[in-house]
Structures are given as structure tokens and as C-alpha cells.
Design a protein with these regions (language model features):
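AMP-forming adenylation/ATP pyrophosphatase catalytic core
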Residues: 2-40, 63, 95, 116, ...
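Repeat-unit-sized solenoid/scaffold elements
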Residues: 126, 210-218, 474-484
Length: 494
């Protein structure tokens, strides 16, 4: 029996084949290559051997991060010789990892290496039009990941460990259910050497501490500890699928939409729903638990509160919960300090499109042949109609700015007298975090607010039966309104 046949019949190869079939990791009939993340360690070396034996077209990818001096160069030389031996194409990348980390604020050396590695893999994935990128994580790696996550506090997603497949098949882990014992036995029979990272013995590194100090204690409790945890991981994967199905079928698809507190309190596992809907806000579990406790109090539920997360805020407002990301908060801050003078009124007939931090403004002028229907024309809250000829006579100096002055008064069309701007914003359910950034059209000569975008307009320059030309100013927001209003703000009689 040839060595190849011996290796093909090895338990490692059988386990890899089962894993590939069970999770549908690879298309056996495809001629597209598989990118192998090859470090030169035992795991990735066995992975390359196994997939090559199973007949897949492999391209190896090796990164030299220059973090371990001569050892890094030794690894590169080893994988070069290995790929020559197996007749596998090798793609290499050399990185100044320390330089990358220092050039990117807040990025550790470990994070830098990860970003550089996956950027390189992604580039190869596109260049080769590859089936996928195969990673060498094995069963023991997954057990260690579970223990690390458990020590930090984790839910189902953290305790089910690494998945066999992620990013819709872009990354796969054919060894994820394979014991390292099989890996070492396979390499022994293949008479295949491998390299060892000297830092793997450093127990000041968290994963190494788990591997060398903590894991052996569990093995004393149960010699089949890895297999026991593997069974638990499979159960947790199923539970995660059930949880994801429940969340997906219960929550709105758009995470910018508000959650009604009364509705949330009636649901199963409301904390899990909060975690999912406001995932981009990155709120601590204790913060979300406090939020739920506050929502259980009917008096508090209707009042305003703000809950901080690492990625933004959640606001409790008028019986709803609304999330705003840090990116959106930054845009709102920019809009608060933004002021834009509109072009001279005489130039409006040519049309204009202007940029704003929260959207875009389009100005158009129409003549009587394009007038609204004789009875009623309804516009969105983001459109403003004015009599163009009245405007030309008055010649106001118009600008768009933020509603930062809470003491300002506005005379809305259809209402008696003047109303405080702050009250109009409250009545329109504008979130407190967004009020100061609400766009308004102001006549600089008189200080009059002509249009509070998305809320109301004044009676100035409104259309009449005598109107011959009219201008339409449209604000197209790029920031969705969580309390989208469908009020018909503009009703024009003819």
C-alpha cells in the first residue's frame, strides 16, 4: 500500500471529509481553488496535506509579520519548501506590523496582524476567484475559545465557539471537529515536519494559559473533556439557530426603527431582543438590564432617558426605545454647527442641488402650467412650496441652519399665533438628541423661520390662486426619522 493510500485512509482525512460534507464547506466538482492559510504550524500543514489528498486545488497563503525575528523568516522558508514539495502555489506577504500598528491609533500589534492577514486573504480570494479561504482551527482551539469566552461572560453566541463556516462560505474550518491528536499522528506517519511558534509556550498570553494551565485540570476531571465540550458546542449551535430564527421573525428588519416598550415587555426573552436590535450600540449587559427594569415601571417608560453604549446611545422616549450610532451622533454634531446660505433667488430658475451633513437640498422653479391640481396638492414634510414672485419682491436673505435656539418662536401655517420652537419639536416627536440639528430655513433680514424641515412651515409666501410661478425646495434626508410622520403639511387651495 503506497504512502498516499495510507494517508488517504488516515482518520484525520476521514474526519476532514465528514466535516466538509456535514457542513457543506466545499464543492467537490468545482475547479476553483481553495486558499489555505498556511503558517507552517502543525494545524495548517495538516490542513494543506489533507485538502491536497482529497483532490482540491490549493493555493497557500503565508504572512511574514516580522514579529519574531529569525523565527519569522524560518517559517517563511519552511512553507516555501513545503509548497515546492507538494507542488502547491504559494503566495507570500511581508508586513511591517509594528509600523502599521503605530500608524493606526488604538490598533494593537495583535489587531494589526489580524487586519493585515485578512486583508491579504481577501485580496487573494478575489484575485483567484477562489471557492473559499480555509483556516486551520481545530477542536482544541474551539474548546479553548469557549473557555476564554466563558471566563469573560458570554451568551449562546460566545459559548458555541467558532463556526465551521462564516461569511456565507468565504471562510471555512475543515479541522474544526478534529482532535489535535489526529493531526500529530497524521504528520508523524507522513514524516512531515512542521514549525513551532516559540511564543506558544508563553503562559502570560491568555490562550496559552488556558491551553497549558487550565485545560489539563479539566482533562483530570474528564479525560474526554474535548469531546464532551464538542457535544455541548453542537447543542449551542442549534440553540443559536433557534434564537436567531425567533429574533429575526420578531424584530423589525430595520434596526433604526424604534421598539415600543409595551410591545417589548410582552415578548419572550426581551433582553435578547434588545441585544440584537441595538447590536451596533454595543451597550453593556448591565446597562440593558437597567433599561429593562426602567421600562417595567410605567411612569418611567413614558419619560425620557438616555443609555450610553460604546457605539452610540439608546433613548427612551414617549414609550419607545430608539438607537443612534456614534457615527450618526457625529453627523448630528456636524449639522448643529452647519450653516448654508441659499443661492440668490434670481438664480433659482436654473435649479440647484446643495449638500448638507444630513442630506441634500434641491431647488426648482415651475410656472403656472406645472401648478398643483386645482383642489389639493400634498407634499412630504421635507418639501416646501413658496410663491416665487412674492419671494422675488421681498428678496429675503435665506439660509439653512440648525435649530439651536430653543427660545426661538415660529408662526406655523394652520396654527394660531406663534409657537416656541422647542414645543414644535417636542410635538413632532423629534428625538432630544436630534433637536439641535433640525434644519430650518431662515430669513436673515427678519430672523423669521420660514420652514422647520420635517415639522412645519410658516404662512409667508404661500401659494394662492394668483400664483404664476412657484418654487419647491426639497430636502432629501440621509438620516431616517424613527418617528416617520405622514402628516399632510402642505394643502394648497386653487
Amino acid at each position: 500500500m503506497s504512502q498516499r493510500r495510507t494517508l488517504l485512509n488516515h482518520a484525520l482525512v476521514h474526519q476532514m471529509r465528514r466535516t466538509i460534507e456535514q457542513y457543506d464547506l466545499l464543492d467537490r466538482q468545482s475547479q476553483r481553488v481553495v486558499i489555505i492559510a498556511l503558517s507552517g504550524g502543525a494545524d495548517s500543514t495538516a490542513l494543506l496535506w489533507g485538502l491536497s489528498l482529497l483532490g482540491y486545488r490549493c493555493v497557500a497563503a503565508h504572512c511574514n509579520f516580522h514579529l519574531r525575528g529569525e523565527e519569522s523568516d524560518r517559517d517563511e522558508a519552511f512553507v516555501t519548501e513545503l509548497c515546492n514539495q507538494l507542488g502547491v502555489t504559494l503566495e507570500r506577504a511581508s508586513f511591517d506590523t509594528y509600523g502599521y500598528a503605530s500608524a493606526h491609533k488604538g490598533v494593537s500589534v495583535e489587531m494589526a496582524a489580524r487586519e493585515l492577514r485578512y486583508d491579504f486573504f481577501d485580496e487573494l480570494y478575489v484575485r483567484y476567484d477562489a471557492q473559499c479561504i480555509a483556516l486551520g482551527h481545530h477542536l482544541e482551539d474551539n474548546v479553548e475559545q469557549l473557555l476564554i469566552n466563558l471566563s469573560q461572560g458570554a451568551g449562546v453566541r460566545g459559548l458555541r465557539g467558532m463556526l465551521p463556516i462564516r461569511e456565507e462560505g468565504k471562510y471555512i474550518r475543515p479541522l474544526i471537529d478534529t482532535s489535535p491528536r489526529l493531526i500529530y499522528d497524521f504528520l508523524r506517519i507522513a514524516e512531515q515536519p512542521f514549525v513551532t511558534d516559540s511564543t506558544n509556550a508563553d503562559t502570560t498570553i491568555r490562550r496559552n494559559f488556558v491551553r497549558h494551565t487550565l485545560r489539563p485540570l479539566f482533562d483530570q476531571l474528564n479525560p474526554s473533556f474535548d469531546q464532551a465540550v464538542a457535544s455541548t458546542i453542537h447543542i449551542l449551535r442549534d440553540l443559536e439557530q433557534l434564537q436567531d430564527y425567533y429574533i429575526k421573525s420578531t424584530l423589525p428588519a430595520d434596526d433604526s426603527l424604534p421598539l415600543e416598550i409595551v410591545w417589548l415587555r410582552q415578548q419572550i426573552a426581551p433582553l435578547a431582543l434588545l441585544y440584537s436590535h441595538f447590536a451596533a450600540i454595543y451597550c453593556d449587559r448591565l446597562v440593558l438590564q437597567q433599561l429593562l427594569m426602567d421600562c417595567s415601571n410605567s411612569e418611567r417608560a413614558d419619560s425620557y432617558a438616555r443609555y450610553e453604549g460604546r457605539g452610540g446611545i439608546i433613548e427612551r422616549y414617549r414609550g419607545y426605545l430608539i438607537g443612534t450610532t456614534s457615527e450618526t451622533l457625529a453627523r448630528l454634531e456636524q449639522a448643529t454647527n452647519f450653516c448654508l446660505e441659499l443661492p440668490a433667488i434670481e438664480s433659482w430658475q436654473a435649479g440647484a442641488v446643495l449638500d448638507h451633513p444630513l442630506g441634500s437640498i434641491e431647488i426648482a422653479v415651475h410656472d403656472s402650467s406645472e401648478m398643483p391640481p386645482p383642489a389639493i396638492r400634498t407634499l412630504t414634510p421635507y418639501s416646501y412650496l413658496v410663491d416665487y414672485d412674492q419671494l422675488r419682491v421681498a428678496m429675503p436673505q435665506l439660509q439653512l441652519s440648525a435649530s439651536t435656539d430653543g427660545e426661538q418662536w415660529v408662526a406655523p401655517l394652520g396654527m394660531k399665533g406663534r409657537k416656541p420652537l422647542a414645543k414644535l419639536l417636542r410635538d413632532a416627536k423629534v428625538l432630544p438628541s436630534r433637536r439641535a440639528a433640525t434644519v430650518q430655513l431662515i430669513d436673515n433680514h427678519t430672523g423669521t423661520t420660514l420652514w422647520l424641515v420635517g415639522v412645519c412651515r410658516s404662512a409667508d409666501y404661500q401659494l394662492t390662486p394668483q400664483t404664476r410661478r412657484w418654487a419647491e425646495i426639497t430636502f432629501t434626508p440621509t438620516l431616517s426619522d424613527p418617528f416617520a410622520r405622514h402628516t399632510e403639511l402642505h394643502t394648497v387651495a386653487r
